[in-house]
A protein has these predicted regions:
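Structured core elements
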Residues: 5-6, 20, 43, 53-55, ...
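Residue-level signal for pocket-adjacent positions within structured domains
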Residues: 27, 49, 175
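Glycine-rich phosphate/pyrophosphate-binding beta-alpha loops
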Residues: 50-52, 56-63
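Short acidic (Asp/Glu) and glycine-rich catalytic loops that position anionic groups and cofactors
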Residues: 45-52, 99-100
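A broadly conserved detector of short glycine/acidic/proline-rich loop/turn motifs that flank catalytic sites
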Residues: 8-10, 25, 48, 58, ...
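A short, polar/proline- and glycine-enriched secondary-structure boundary/capping micro-motif
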Residues: 32, 63-67
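A conserved regulatory-domain signal marking ACT and ACT-like small-molecule sensing domains
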Residues: 67, 72-186
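Substrate-binding/catalytic subdomain of NAD(P)-dependent oxidoreductase enzymes
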Residues: 1-34, 39-41
Length: 186
């Protein structure tokens, strides 16, 4: 299963800065999925230390006071730090549409023949492969509806947005598709 988490993700790949914050699904076996309450967690991956996980208090009066005090100290010695810095390599910030990853999709549709093939056809056109699919009866008093849940293999976010735009305009779609990014730490 998965757990919903608000993650900030920063990576540097080929001189591009990847820096996003969004709610996503995380496998419930991952350490980061178990971080709750006043705690924050950080996963650091590098060529040298592989994967490290850090957890500590990040909310509440004492952690907040510590952060504020740290910011004041950093600000007060900023001028001295600026003089000691070497040149920083400039990296290009990446657009979220360039993200690659898995997705959870929930479609609300009329329950009729051809719905699943209509959805999968649009996914196929955009090079998106399904990992799993489940269909349940939907809730509607006017017509027979279905809820279709799909998880995908890794794909390009730009392709996913193009596919969802087309799918949401299909005549059997009852409401806009719900999508949540899935973050894999393997």
């Amino acid at each position: 299963g998965y757990k919903v988490k608000l993650l900030g993700i920063t990576q540097i790949r080929k001189k591009n800065l990847i820096n996003f914050v969004y709610p996503c699904l995380v496998d419930h076996n991952e350490l980061i999925s178990k971080v709750d309450g006043v705690f924050n967690g950080i996963i650091v991956e590098s060529d040298f230390c592989k994967k490290s996980f850090f957890q500590g208090e990040g909310a509440g009066s004492q952690p907040t006071a510590t952060s504020v005090l740290s910011d004041i100290i950093d600000f007060s010695i900023k001028e001295r730090k600026e003089k000691s810095k070497s040149k920083i390599n400039i990296v290009k910030n990446t657009n979220i549409l360039d993200r690659s990853g898995s997705f959870y999709l929930r479609f609300s549709t009329v329950d009729q023949p051809g719905v699943i093939s209509g959805i999968t056809n649009e996914l196929k056109k955009n090079n998106i492969s399904m990992k799993s699919m489940l269909q349940k009866d939907g809730i509607s008093k006017e017509k027979k509806c279905a809820t279709i849940v799909v998880t995908t293999h890794n794909c390009n976010e730009k392709d996913m947005m193009k596919a969802l735009k087309k799918i949401n305009n299909l005549n059997f779609v009852v409401k806009k598709t719900t999508f949540i990014r899935i973050e894999n730490f393997k």
